[in-house]
């Protein structure tokens, strides 16, 4: 095979590695993806009836405070001035998220000064001193009233489990802002790609030394590749090793898309549904991500209802569950990965951690700098093959959205 590096997966991690190795190191790179499109879960496409850009795998919002990542992304796309804001419905009323001073005033029906709100939440949170489950942990952070309104039902739908039966460690913090700032992210840089995610990702792959093969499963070719050419693998870690140490637990998402005969369904890009008797967790309305696009129809809109559940084998894995059993399996898989000659493991699936897009790019740049560049610079030396898991990873964290 006349290539210097094989990358399994064409998401942000894989394409960043491929682009940097091709453009920065002069390598011939083959990118393989089992799907029929480029871009992993960031893939977007125009809904055919309306032309509205839809994020097929749930809303993806780009944000970062990493200047290097921002500068790198801007090589391939310009960004809009979009700033993400989220609202939640509960018992027929709408509140801004994450919980902020406006949310507190709206929910309790009076005006609070910041110090008054802090004192109120502290008093309500004092109900629980030694949390033994997720419900008690959440109450110890924000108090029972706000927990019952915005966390309990939403969490039960996410995990398909009563929060009293979930471990406390799932939630380590619940941000509360004692200002009226209702921006979802606090990063220095934020926006959406002007031409969409797929155009951005295609530009990353558009290099004469990069070949992309879609509908091609790396695992079908593994025996021919591993040991003969260096590999960066971004697929599921447990699947690479044939689930020999057991399956790593994931949550998955199901989506229900609908074209509606109205120019505006909900007035905002994302609406959470905190009531437990509403089966979906949130609704996306994609036209609101790009209000600057004048070609969107005035009489039609596209919505996507999102449902959360435990992933079974064959489902698309989104969020690591990260139980104690999962962490034990992960350690075993990391040991196997460290002994895998000529293979580096990276990305969300390859390291069993939740990665926002900017985190995936940063991690890929680090792999190129610290593993691949030194390897190929010293490729003439014997026994100098990249291998292993790429170093320890931060603990996965559960999140409420596809890529926030």
Regions found by a protein language model. Give the residues of each.
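Active-site/ligand-binding neighborhood in enzyme catalytic cores
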Residues: 91-96, 101-230, 241
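Beta1/beta-strand and adjacent pyrophosphate-binding region of the FAD-binding site
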Residues: 1-13, 30
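Dinucleotide-binding Rossmann-like beta1-alpha1 core, especially the glycine-rich loop
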Residues: 49-124
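Glycine-rich FAD pyrophosphate-binding loop
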Residues: 19-48
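Mid-domain catalytic core of redox enzymes
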Residues: 24, 216-338
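Short, well-ordered alpha-helices that flank and scaffold nucleotide-derived cofactor binding pockets
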Residues: 19, 23, 206, 366-369, ...
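Conserved flavin/dinucleotide-binding core of flavoenzymes
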Residues: 46, 284-391, 395-399, 403-404
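Conserved beta-strand segments of alpha/beta enzyme cores
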Residues: 28, 53, 78, 209-213, ...
